Design a protein with these regions (language model features):
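Conserved DEDDh/DEDDy metal-dependent 3′-5′ exonuclease domain
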Residues: 1-110
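Short acidic-hydrophobic catalytic motif
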Residues: 163
């Protein structure tokens, strides 16, 4: 993308619903690259959980559940940071986009029927609000951090900051440096 300004404008347009699946990493990319966070936001993974389809349901499993389509998983672990993307990666990404609209439509309809649409949209607002206000709070993602004493928590904060700095300098995902 040579000029990202139109994308940034679209992401903040309140008249356009943005649909993501498990979008936390996407939100960070938008914030760092474009300086914006999308609103309104419908996260299909969170919607599926609210509808009782399963907590943390992966995209492939959700497409299988809703569309009865078995997506290939061959490119799941490929290097998505390399450029140009391979033809196989482009096809894989295209399939993701192809099925996302159908998944969204079904989940949206279920949310409306069960009176949960506002819950999903509020969850999207919460996700972007939390990210928008978090300053170097990467240690908060560690689920067991609450068990640590002050010294251990200080060490965790230092390691998380090192991981963040290293990931940025290498232009790699945090999980490739040290997983949560």
């Amino acid at each position: 993308i040579k000029d990202p300004a139109p994308l940034a404008t679209l992401l903040v347009d309140p008249a356009v619903l943005k649909v993501l699946h498990s979008g936390s990493e996407d939100l960070e990319v938008f914030q760092r690259w474009l300086g914006v966070l999308p609103q309104p936001l419908f996260d299909t993974q969170r919607a599926a959980a609210l509808l009782g389809l399963g907590f943390g349901l992966g995209y492939r499993a959700l497409v299988q559940e809703i569309c009865a389509v078995d997506l290939p998983k061959g490119e799941t672990c490929s290097d998505w940071l390399q450029r140009p993307l391979t033809e196989s990666q482009c096809e894989y990404a295209g399939l993701d986009v192809t099925w996302l609209q159908r998944v969204w439509r079904e989940l949206h309809e279920q949310c409306v029927r069960q009176d949960k649409l506002q819950w999903v949209l509020a969850d999207g607002r919460d996700a972007t609000s939390a990210l928008g206000t978090e300053v170097d709070g990467f240690h908060r993602r560690i689920k067991t951090a609450w068990k640590l004493n002050r010294r251990q928590l200080g060490n965790l904060v230092a390691v998380c900051q090192w991981r963040e700095d290293t990931a940025r300098s290498r232009d790699k995902p945090r999980s490739w440096i040290i997983d949560d």
